[in-house]
């Protein structure tokens, strides 16, 4: 019994001893952990100089600055990426497309000639210097932001004069017509031996050439082929166009005054001619009895034509036969265009009555003077498949001289301000199936022409008159969406007299600083302007061909004025 009690007591003592040592061990371990943590914390504070909460206040600001630097760097990189994308995806393909277009035009021209070699059309198509590739017939200035009138013409530049001048006091050179394609240019004017008022006999000078760049970098026009048509055929009011087969020309043949022609009952004779690359000229009479069956007088617009969709398009105007189908369909039609910020004070009914009467001026016996466009297929056969388009007079004013232009993918018709509206007009033109459609025009309020009262330069109300002068605008500045912003032109800056020729860039309201040809009393007449670019130097030039008074040798001398387009970056 005692032995059993002793064993139990011994076991209890052993259990208590184990519990005591276990407790001591646990305390020791906890103390060791605490000491280790304390030493580690002290070491960390010492080695890292750990900040107190007060020291951490500026950290968000530092982080924000770092974020800004990173964002700025990323933005800068994005600008670089955008520029690379623009160059690779937009500009380079466009430049290649322009080059391809020029090459294809040249190949087309050569193809036409090769196919026509058997018909003696000639071979050896000329081509402008490579410096001009992509700089002819293009949208030369595309700018949405700059003020149009911050662009302006330089002083006139000396260059090679490619236009023959009169050689006697009674000689007269008048009515210049010019057109340029991607491969060559065409020029023509009328030559009268016995004064500018002689309507019975004249020559027609016609030339074909190319743009060159001299060794010193100067622009010049090089005539390669020319002919003086002196054959007792009195060609008048000629329009010229550069086509793949050479220089196509449309002329009327007349032996009477304009007033007498309007009094006749038959259409005016017309010819389609061509100066080939071989220097040979051929022409063919058009069947005007069929083509102009509703007309008593019909003339080319004197301004250049344009090669579009394998056809050449010429401006035409003249008098309609009273009560003919073409005349009847226009009866009651009219359009009124208004000056910028200068409205006509006349009653609306009176304005409408005067606008309707403006199409039938008394000078031409009350005949309706109509605008039109003639297109002819370009082939080795002249005068092939002619088609006449007569636009409605709800769009066009009284018929007048004009010009058909192509710039980029856009086509335009310029109409001389022979009626009451003085500011220059450019009608957008679309072509389809051999015919043309004209749309509401761009107007340039500061680009006026002189005229007789009540249709002087400042006129603002509809009236019946035949006045003005041919001074065409050339589309120069475009929006990126290809709509027109501004034009270049050489205008006669006088209210009533043909005086004071000045060149400028025009928007729809105002004009740039001007370049004056001479004094404000200098007499002048027709002007026609064409812009182009020397791609190598990225310089834009304008050839403005102007009739300037020349008292010693003939009444007028036709002068090819050349300017560079500059920009005032301060505007």
From Swiss-Prot:
Residues 48-571 are virion surface. Residues 1-26 are intravirion. Its main location: virion. Residues 234-239 are annotated as: Involved in neuraminidase activity. Glycans are attached at residues 119, 341, 433, 481, 508, 538. GO terms for molecular function: exo-alpha-sialidase activity; host cell surface receptor binding. The keyword Electron transport does not apply. Pfam families: HN. It is a single-pass type II membrane protein. It is an enzyme of class 3 (hydrolase). Signal peptide: none annotated. GO terms for biological process: symbiont entry into host cell; virion attachment to host cell. It catalyses: Hydrolysis of alpha-(2->3)-, alpha-(2->6)-, alpha-(2->8)- glycosidic linkages of terminal sialic acid residues in oligosaccharides, glycoproteins, glycolipids, colominic acid and synthetic substrates. One of its GO terms (cellular component) is membrane. The keyword Membrane applies. Its EC number is 3.2.1.18. The C-terminus (head domain) is involved in binding the cellular receptor. Mediates the viral entry into the host cell together with fusion/F protein. Attaches the virus to sialic acid-containing cell receptors and thereby initiates infection. Binding of HN protein to the receptor induces a conformational change that allows the F protein to trigger virion/cell membranes fusion. This is Hemagglutinin-neuraminidase. It comes from Newcastle disease virus (strain Her/33) (NDV).
